[in-house]
Amino acid sequence: MAARRANCALVLVLALALLAARDAGAAAVPKPNWLGGLSRAAFPKRFVFGTATSAYQVEGMAASGGRGPSIWDAFAHTPGNVAGNQNGDVATDQYHRYKEDVNLMKSLNFDAYRFSISWSRIFPDGEGRVNQEGVAYYNNLINYLLQKGITPYVNLYHYDLPLALEKKYGGWLNAKMADLFTEYADFCFKTFGNRVKHWFTFNEPRIVALLGYDQGTNPPKRCTKCAAGGNSATEPYIVAHNFLLSHAAAVARYRTKYQAAQQGKVGIVLDFNWYEALSNSTEDQAAAQRARDFHIGWYLDPLINGHYPQIMQDLVKDRLPKFTPEQARLVKGSADYIGINQYTASYMKGQQLMQQTPTSYSADWQVTYVFAKNGKPIGPQANSNWLYIVPWGMYGCVNYIKQKYGNPTVVITENGMDQPANLSRDQYLRDTTRVHFYRSYLTQLKKAIDEGANVAGYFAWSLLDNFEWLSGYTSKFGIVYVDFNTLERHPKASAYWFRDMLKH
């Protein structure tokens, strides 16, 4: 009997172990060269590793807790705008599950969490009345992060303008946004700044200008041919200008009113895809540089040098707003560090420049995107049609910023890849392609750091599968799988890869 009971116990233990392995996903994944020579110790001593999300993509409670609607609420609730007519009303419900998510970060050995504050959760109308229930939520999240030893990196704006400000003032087309944003930022600095020491003003303002005012696919859906009206040749430049002035005003407020006592820093998050010349021809080389100037230079040149890139001034001419001397002084040097969201790369094919009839910001580049060279793709494609997996693009971006802009402090604020929506749970959990993605991109980042690039941290996008904007829930960027029927979280192989890599 004793032997039989022992055998039964052994069978039970083995069965439980198999179930645990199946649930973890990573435990059953083959691990040849699992870490690829990477470890925490391979990076600089104070280098920060974290994960990132944004408010509308994960919080839920969109119409509850005193929150006012944002432009994304109105957009997602309009049929036909988002895949499957999905929205962020519930998302991953981090509003109620933040402790579970913070505990997950801690178990995976992350140092920091980059999240955004929903402006309309603090100010339901974008200005005036404060929603104390929203303030309490962010206080609770920040306090719990610190309790668990995780550093908050707080982004003040991630696409989600309060709808009231769009309706009342016309949103980012109105120069008054600088004052409105500064008052919102001031409240956040005053309320949370005794615990938050790492701030970002905006996430990807270029994307807002491109998709919201040039192509018209995202809110507020303005473009030359859009039903809502707009001008793709002028409005993107006006919006970008107002973002830069709003950023500079908020940073000036922090530096004069709070920085001495709080000892924090404020940066901005910019997207940067690497552009490689298709050939050594003069036209292709010039096209690649032009693309970099119209992409990252649009924001970094003013922030570092106080003016827009010369090629933009030459091609865009009087459609490009001008900084007054006082504005240029405020904008120049207004970022304590630069956040870079880096995902992909493409080849650039050039042409002889010509003075053409202005049609759009995109057309002003006068380049052709190419994704293969001599019949060889630039890299495998992830689920998103824009996302080619090109690890050396990470090196290209970081090294370029070092060389062109005097090696400012950079934080990689997003980096990741997505899976499609038609996989089984087991396939989601066994995300070996994502493991390879992170291993190869971090290897290229380490190479740039070893060569002198001033990079202070890295944030994986994203902690959770979440609401991925136009794609709704059909695009899965998380290192943690979310069952959107139950909202249960299950770490993927990539999550365990980070856990193991960050142990040493």
Swiss-Prot record:
Reaction equations catalysed: Hydrolysis of terminal, non-reducing beta-D-glucosyl residues with release of beta-D-glucose
Main location: secreted
A GO cellular component annotation in the UniProt record: extracellular region
Binding sites annotated in the UniProt record for a beta-D-glucoside: 57, 158, 203-204, 343, 414, 461, 468-469, 477
Domain of life of the organism encoding this protein: Eukaryota
Outcome of substituting residue 273 to V: Increases KM for substrate about 5-fold
Active-site residues annotated for this sequence: 204 (proton donor), 414 (nucleophile)
Record InterPro entries: Glyco_hydro_1, Glycoside_hydrolase_SF
GO biological process: carbohydrate metabolic process
Chain's role: Hydrolyzes p-nitrophenyl beta-D-glucoside, p-nitrophenyl beta-D-mannoside, p-nitrophenyl beta-D-galactoside, p-nitrophenyl beta-D-xyloside, p-nitrophenyl beta-D-fucoside, p-nitrophenyl beta-L-arabinoside, oligosaccharides, pyridoxine beta-D-glucoside and the cyanogenic glucosides amygdalin, prunasin and dhurrin. Possesses pyridoxine transglucosylation activity.
Name this protein carries in UniProt: Beta-glucosidase 7
Organism annotation: Oryza sativa subsp. japonica
Organism phylogeny: Eukaryota, Viridiplantae, Streptophyta, Embryophyta, Tracheophyta
